[in-house]
Amino acid sequence: MKRIDLIRQIESLGCILIRHGAKHDWYRNPNTGVSQPIPRHREIGEILARKIIRMLANAEPDDKNVRADQ
């Protein structure tokens, strides 16, 4: 999947960019509080893209992906 297509999909879920990292951008869903890194590659594997979308769209946040201070 193209990175830009993944970004469009997660932004349509209501996710926002929270920071730029060295090799990844971090997006957070303010409704669930879940954050996920998005790699800065032109192409992102389909399995990884589906995992990112599933995690950010999930109504139940996963403990390891949520920071307590957010």
Residue ranges and their predicted role:
Residues 1-14:
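Polyanion-binding surface elements
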Residues 26, 37:
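Conserved beta-strand positions that form and line the central face of beta-propeller blades
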Residues 17-20:
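Short beta-strand
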Residues 32-36:
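Short, charged/polar, Gly/Pro-enriched secondary-structure boundary elements
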Residues 40-70:
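C-terminal structural segments of small proteins and small subunits
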Residues 27-31:
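Active-site beta-strand termini and strand-to-loop segments that position acidic
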Residues 23:
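A generic "binding-loop/recognition-motif" signal
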